[in-house]
Swiss-Prot record:
This is Small ribosomal subunit protein uS13. The lineage of its organism: Bacteria, Pseudomonadati, Thermodesulfobacteriota, Desulfovibrionia, Desulfovibrionales. One of its GO terms (cellular component) is cytosol. GO terms for molecular function: rRNA binding; structural constituent of ribosome; tRNA binding. The keyword Cytoplasm does not apply.
Length: 123
């Protein structure tokens, strides 16, 4: 089992699929990485040689932000928006959608579960 960017690649998966287990790498990026390193994308991840693994690792470190670095950059970007007090930052702070979706009836994912209406007390 190859370990790249702190992630154990799954066994018996094609390399283009196995690389997508790394945060920040999708299918297109995985194919681009494999093409630049000269690794066959149909090859299984458990059939990689140590040289191929090292080439992929070097390519990732040199040209791509993945895993922790990417997560930190995303978090820092959201924090910056909240600090400068722009509209998107306020929406993030309040836990509401910030891309213009309606919130009257939808956006339950961002708002969380519904708060029920309290039953009126009988007098």
């Amino acid at each position: 089992m190859a370990r790249i960017a702190g992630v154990d690649l799954p066994k018996n998966k094609r390399m283009d699929i196995a690389l997508t287990y790394i945060f920040g790498i999708g299918r297109t990026t995985a194919l681009r990485i494999l093409e630049s390193t000269g690794v066959d994308w149909t090859k299984n991840s458990d059939a990689l040689t140590s040289e191929e693994t090292n080439n992929i690792r070097k390519e990732l470190e040199a040209n791509y932000k993945v895993e922790g670095d990417l997560r930190r950059e995303i978090t820092a970007g959201i924090k910056r928006l909240m600090d400068i007090g722009c509209y998107r930052g306020l929406r993030h702070r309040r836990g509401l959608p910030c891309r213009g979706q309606r919130t009257h009836t939808n956006s339950r994912t961002r708002k969380g579960p519904r708060r029920g209406v309290m039953a009126k007390k009988k007098k």
